[in-house]
Amino acid sequence: MDEVKEFTSKQFFYTLLTLPSTLKLIFQLEKRYAIYLIVLNAITAFVPLASLFIYQDLINSVLGSGRHLINIIIIYFIVQVITTVLGQLESYVSGKFDMRLSYSINMRLMRTTSSLELSDYEQADMYNIIEKVTQDSTYKPFQLFNAIIVELSSFISLLSSLFFIGTWNIGVAILLLIVPVLSLVLFLRVGQLEFLIQWQRASSERETWYIVYLLTHDFSFKEIKLNNISNYFIHKFGKLKKGFINQDLAIARKKTYFNIFLDFILNLINILTIFAMILSVRAGKLLIGNLVSLIQAISKINTYSQTMIQNIYIIYNTSLFMEQLFEFLKRESVVHKKIEDTEICNQHIGTVKVINLSYVYPNSNAFALKNINLSFEKGELTAIVGKNGSGKSTLVKIISGLYQPTMGIIQYDKMRSSLMPEEFYQKNISVLFQDFVKYELTIRENIGLSDLSSQWEDEKIIKVLDNLGLDFLKTNNQYVLDTQLGNWFQEGHQLSGGQWQKIALARTFFKKASIYILDEPSAALDPVAEKEIFDYFVALSENNISIFISHSLNAARKANKIVVMKDGQVEDVGSHDVLLRRCQYYQELYYSEQYEDNDE
């Protein structure tokens, strides 16, 4: 999709092959309302033909003998009432169907996005796809279905009107089809161009969203204000938006030129047709009522033709989108097709072995990890140290199942990671990430999200809060677990960075897991809080596998075993004293840290 391809009839029909899949998806999600809309539109489609015949008879009766005039007026009134009722009913059902379908598809999309791998979210192309499918899914599927229904309804009404004109002159009826066919070809070309432009600018649209996000949230406000860079971002936003406007105006100009050209041809045909009808009236071959109804029929043909062209344009344009949506939804069915064994998921893990492990990030040729061999045992506290970029965080993401190894294996009590279902990692591993989430939710939710089955066990929540010293969450010397945290919502309580980190730690420890992993757990903590956390972590490691990443070698000294990493490889493994004697790289890290501490 990197370049605009020339529109062809073959490509057009190939794109329309998504229609059966679209209809199948819609009927799976909202079958009842889809049927309601089809029935209502089918009934409505035949009303115009009935109206033409009634209107014709009404005028001829008024100008003629007046026989059956009352009956015709009553029938005309009934038809108008039915038309109004059907229109209102169709509008209500259509609105309800739109809302329900949008909800159902968004739920499906969220399930798909939640089943993606972490590596998917580390690629810009995936963000662009997610941006487009989530943004357009709120209206495109309904727009496509509605366009199909209206297209069929308009087609029936068009044939009815052509049949009505054909009763006077079949040649004129055929002539009136020229403009719709010509319009179709021209507008489909524009439709393809419009879709490709919108799809290709997904990255830029995401950039505008990000700028708005920066300018409207507290986390970035301080730097933007102090550095006086709001105008920089506003200018950047305006430049991108102007580019979008210029692209949209170019498409609008093309549509306008086509419309002017087609309207000229259409009006020319209409004038010639009406002139021929007038000649027939003057020759006594056509009644006035017939003339008026035929002119109305021509007007309806023009209306239905334009409606059909617009809807074919919409069908084609939205079908291009649906191709991308279906490609994205397929990801849900291919992710984590592994053995599903409840017993495996629930057993307590005692050993993790990393064997000949190497990892290369997508779209990269460099090894982030290379030939890693390690073991982690229950009852053992392991620290992983090294400079930034040494592969520490990548390693724990592989151990926790967020990445799959490029080469080598991970064994959990001799069970290979490649065969483990996602549920295994979710039940057995609890991780504090360096970029932990600050949930703008209640205390209960902030802690209980790691184990939803225990979210309403107040005693369990309070116990972990007390163990980690989260007294700052108390109100009148007690925890009110439904207190809102953060300042995004009403009655929220703002917290410091260190307080948010302690809450994230409490959430990590609240989960009953076999393996606990902390990535820079003391980055925002004061010395007292750091000691409390590590004391609790050491106690926790007696019956579990416990791993933590740290830049601080003083913190690492608390571990039974220290893994030293350098440039994606394991430099050495041992206790602090052993490493200080035999590992030159560890010595460099240690003395560098001591120098910095003394310098302070």
From Swiss-Prot:
Residues 352-592 form the ABC transporter domain. The keyword Nucleotidyltransferase does not apply. Residues 34-317 form the ABC transmembrane type-1 domain. It comes from the Bacteria. Probably implicated in the export process of the lantibiotic nisin. Belongs to the ABC transporter superfamily. Nisin exporter (TC 3.A.1.111.3) family. This is Nisin transport ATP-binding protein NisT.
